[in-house]
Amino acid sequence: MKKIYLAVFTMALLLAACGDKKSENVRLSGTLQGMADDTVYLYGTDRYYNRLDTIFVKQGKFVKDIEVDTLVSAWLQFGNGMEYPLYMDKADLIEISGSADKPGLLAIKGNPANEELTRFHQELFGKDLPSEAAVEKAAEAFIRSHPNSLASIYVLDKYFVQKSVPDFSKIKELSEQMAGSLKDRLYMEQLLEYLESYEKVSVGKSASYFQIPGMDGKDIRRTDFKDKYLLLYFWASWSDACRETSRQLKQLYKEKKNREKFDILGVSLDVDKEVWKDAVVNDTLDWKQGCDLKGWNASLVGQFAVRTLPYNVLLAPSGRIEGRNLTQKEIEEKLAEIAKKK
């Protein structure tokens, strides 16, 4: 009888221990305005390929458990194409609130890096829209005061690396302020590798020879645009932002292609030839189109250090890089400036 009681008592202890064991999963929960029933994608550091999970939003709310082994950087990508960084560690209870239309003002509780970035954005953008100089000053102060925070890598990337004309000396100076543990993170390693590539094709540098298969299968070469200013326009059929930018470029192309010795070469990141061709036809894009069907591994993506879509690089007839990631207004101003020099 004593053996039976002992066995029952031991089993009860085991069940109690199991019941008290804290889950090491991350619990994500949130309320998002402007998202009744939608989908949010969760990506790892390589947000082009490394999808971690899919979050289904119902009536603006969601709850999701995510399994992680250590502190990780991730990305929330919303249905409108907007994205926002997220930091998760084992057993974190993370609450997200705000509007999917304004991810820069999301409030994220749980994990110090999330809360630090939330405070930074709310203090900076919570009231009036700050000037570019004010944003850069605040971003620099954040990095210097948070040398151990994963959020500092994002701030460096967003507000310094992604500028149309990055200040490489400033970026290197700020990266040196970061703790060694941050420099070993994959996100930071990728960022430094990108900077090395970008510096070789920054404004003022010369673009090397390139070619890309056209819609008819024949190669399109840089020499096909002799004596013309060429806008390399990186896009993809699956990006709504790209399709909208293409529509805006059509009017510019119509006005400038003959008068300013200006041309456009569309460089698609599609991987399906028929889908790519259908998009070109449906959007009635008149300029030449090239695609090697390799997505983000496309040769010109690496050659010109492209990380976002839509994106553009303006080349002079000599091959000199005149501008990167220009707005339509900046393209028009650059062409007007060039015309005055003739």
Regions found by a protein language model. Give the residues of each.
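Hydrophobic beta-strand anchors of alpha/beta hydrolase catalytic cores
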Residues: 231-232, 264
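A non-transmembrane, solvent-exposed segment enriched in polar/low-complexity residues
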Residues: 18-142
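Bacterial Sec-dependent N-terminal signal peptides
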Residues: 1-30, 340-342
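N-terminal "domain-start" segment that seeds a small globular fold
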Residues: 189-222, 287, 334-341
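Structural microenvironment flanking redox-active thiols in thiol-disulfide oxidoreductases
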Residues: 243-283, 295-302
